[in-house]
A protein has these predicted regions:
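N-terminal polybasic phosphate/anion-binding patch
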Residues: 1-74, 87, 142, 149, ...
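Anionic-ligand binding region
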Residues: 99-104, 114-134
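Active-site-adjacent loop/tail segments of enzyme domains
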Residues: 80-110, 136-138
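Short beta-strand-to-turn element immediately C-terminal to the catalytic PLP-Schiff-base lysine
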Residues: 83, 117-119, 137, 174
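Active-site oxyanion/phosphate-handling segment shared across diverse enzymes
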Residues: 127-201
Length: 202
């Protein structure tokens, strides 16, 4: 019996290679349709919100934008924000910005807020938020330079300017939270939702 029972693949409203890999590893067939939305504009119009609320809003807006053009399809949106105290970070624009961000996070504990939403025909069928707390070790500037040289521009694709699934793990001394939350896709609640609705084998 196949694990995926829905008539059509799940639509992923994201260009994230990591999210795609997580879902495909769980035997979820995908149609990938990255959402084209103005994330910063949406945040501005929403006014003052918490990091978790921002992630949830953007996950919904991504799914909603793609679902509008795909009637009847299950569309998954996902987003992640990083907060250090009251400061919320966005993806670094370049390696220089990534370096400054990692220097700011060095030796401190920050939070990753991940959110997912499934929308079909404009209706929100499922929403979930999760938080992970990560503490960076006090690494040297020379280590930071070597890390960025090895990791390259890939770090700018992540809100944290690191990839814990790769060499970014060397930046940390403690991690609290679900691995999939850190990757930006809380997988277990999503799988539970899909099973409860008969779209995955139970």
């Amino acid at each position: 019996m196949p694990l995926w029972l829905a008539d059509q693949p799940l639509v992923l409203a994201s260009k994230s290679k990591v999210r795609r890999s997580v879902l495909e590893s769980a035997a979820i067939p995908l149609d990938v349709h990255p959402a084209d939305i103005d994330e910063r504009g949406i945040e501005t119009r929403a006014g003052t919100t918490t990091p978790g609320e921002i992630a949830a809003l953007l996950a919904c807006e991504k799914a909603r934008a793609v679902a509008a053009g795909l009637p009847g399809r299950l569309v998954l949106g996902a987003d992640q924000t990083l907060a250090l105290g009251e400061r919320v970070f966005t993806k670094p624009a370049d390696l220089a910005a990534a370096r400054e961000q990692l220097k700011t996070l060095r030796g401190r504990t920050h939070e990753l807020h991940a959110a997912i939403a499934i929308i079909r025909d404009g209706a929100i069928l499922f929403e979930h938020r999760a938080i992970a707390r990560l503490t960076m070790r006090v690494f040297s500037d020379s280590f930071l330079d070597a890390y960025l040289e090895g990791a390259g521009s890939a770090v700018t694709a992540s809100v944290g300017a690191y990839q814990v699934e790769k060499t970014g793990i060397h930046l940390f001394e403690r991690i609290e939270g679900d691995h999939f939350t850190i990757l930006g896709l809380p997988l277990l609640p999503l799988l539970d939702f899909l099973r409860r609705n008969g779209w995955m084998a139970a």
